[in-house]
Design a protein with these regions (language model features):
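Catalytic active-site module of serine/aspartate enzymes centered on a nucleophile-bearing elbow/loop
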Residues: 409-446
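Conserved acidic catalytic loop of the alpha/beta-hydrolase fold
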Residues: 127, 141-155
Length: 446
């Protein structure tokens, strides 16, 4: 039976659904391709829609210092993936100073200035003028309903991953009677603030690092010694020392900084045990042979379109949330998150400062989404998800009047395409409408 169109959003915000489906539809959605036309779309501001344009592709200076997504519930380098989490590559020493020890108040004016400069550059290069004020998620949801109508589908069948769950949940809230079979995998919790979203993702990464270190130490060839805490500290020590004196790499003029190592570690943690081996090799080379060549290879995978992806994420996210707090609040948060997430927490507290400086801000307060009257919505959460913590999936499934939670026991960001048993349950729902039973747990094959 042909069911019409299945619309896909791979996350971001800022990732191209068009490029993602071109690259991944054959493999990622093999189980449903016989029944659906798989449609990727670029939301407003993204890719082949009228894009937010900030600079020539080779001009990295226009990247906001850390982007709102640093780290962020984001598109994973997983089987369900078109791209990588791009914008944890802070270019600026000021920002890395904030991450490593300079007081928040001392670093704040310079960070704010970077965001202001980035906004000015994006505003100057983006046509039509004023687009930066109209790329919020609710506007994208209205566009998506027009796409649904144009495609001839009475109902929207949809699979959203990571940020795509936020887009999908808002669609179901605004257009419940148009909502068909909807899968939200790697869920964001729409009821929490931007800072809570950032802090949750940061703590998730910190937990994922400890899980990885334990896995590494239980296997062969792990360069990290002691227990998981000691091993995590060795990763932080490597980052700090490479920021002092960058590691030589296979490219003579491009030594690898600690900031880049942190980005590469984070990128690797979006994967799972299938891909963690390359992180172990990279750490071993850096710690025991004082070379960053393998880390350089990982960072190369993450830099595609870094300028515009970071800026688009910035623009969309800042419009989705009001600025929350002031310098005193942000400074206190900075101390708290550095304590809770010492490896990745350095940038987290700047999100509201960055959005305030960016200047295009939201007015809608975060609130639970109920989607009253919508068809059943399948929410999928992975217990070891580093970017969208499992409790967010539980929370979203509880908020939705017709939500059903499927739990994947496993690591890595998002479940679909990662674990065959989970993928099959999702495919069955999309093809037949049959939901997994309440409380259903699926596991990775070992």
């Amino acid at each position: 039976i042909h069911r019409g169109s299945l619309f896909i959003n791979p996350g971001g915000p800022g990732e191209s659904g068009v490029q993602y489906v071109e690259a991944a539809a054959e493999t990622s959605f093999a189980g449903v391709q016989g029944s659906y036309d798989i449609i990727g779309f670029d939301p407003r501001g993204v890719g082949s829609s009228t894009p937010i344009t900030c600079a020539a592709a080779n001009d990295a200076a226009a990247t906001p210092a850390a982007g709102v997504g640093a780290p962020q519930a984001d598109t994973p380098p997983s089987p369900v993936d078109g791209g990588a989490n791009n914008d944890y590559k802070e270019k600026s020493p000021e920002v890395d100073a904030a991450a490593s020890g300079t007081s928040f108040e001392d670093a704040a004016p310079r960070i704010a200035d970077e965001y202001k400069q980035a906004e000015a550059q994006c505003a100057a290069n983006t046509k039509p003028a004023g687009l930066l004020d109209h790329v919020d998620t609710v506007s994208a949801v209205r566009d998506l309903d027009i796409l649904r109508a144009l495609s001839g589908n009475e109902k929207l069948d949809y699979a959203g991953f990571s940020y795509g769950t936020y887009l999908g949940a808002h669609y179901a809230e605004l257009f419940p009677s148009n909502t068909g079979r909807m899968v939200l995998d790697g869920a964001l919790d729409p009821s929490i603030s931007l800072y809570e979203r950032q802090a949750g993702a940061t703590k998730g990464l910190e937990r994922a690092l400890q899980t990885y270190v334990g896995w590494c130490q239980a296997g062969q060839g792990c360069p990290l010694t002691g227990g998981t805490e000691a091993g995590s500290q060795q990763v932080r020590d490597l980052i700090a020392s490479a920021n002092q004196s960058p590691l030589p790499s296979s490219e003579p003029n491009r030594p690898v900084t600690g900031t880049e190592i942190r980005a590469a570690v984070m990128y690797s943690l979006y994967g799972d045990e299938q891909t963690w081996g390359s992180l172990t090799s990279s750490l071993d080379e850096a710690i025991n042979r004082h070379s960053g060549s393998l880390f350089r290879q990982i960072t190369e995978q993450t830099v595609a379109d870094v300028v515009n992806t970071a800026a688009v994420r910035q623009a969309i996210t800042c419009l989705d949330y009001p600025v929350d707090g002031d310098m005193a609040v942000w400074s206190a948060r900075h101390q708290e998150i550095k304590h809770d997430a010492p490896t990745f927490g350095g940038m987290t507290a700047i999100v509201d400062l960055g959005c305030q400086a960016w200047g295009h801000n939201g007015t809608r307060e975060p609130a639970p989404i109920h989607a009253k009257g919508a068809a059943p919505i399948l929410v999928v959460g992975s217990t070891g998800d580093p970017a969208t913590p499992y409790e967010w999936a539980r929370s979203l499934a509880d908020q939705l009047d017709t939500g059903r939670l499927l739990t994947r026991e496993g690591n890595g960001h998002v479940a679909y395409g990662r674990a065959a048993a989970c993928t099959q349950l999702v495919d069955t729902y999309l093809l037949t409408g049959e939901l997994p039973s309440p409380g259903r747990v699926c596991r990775d094959e070992t």
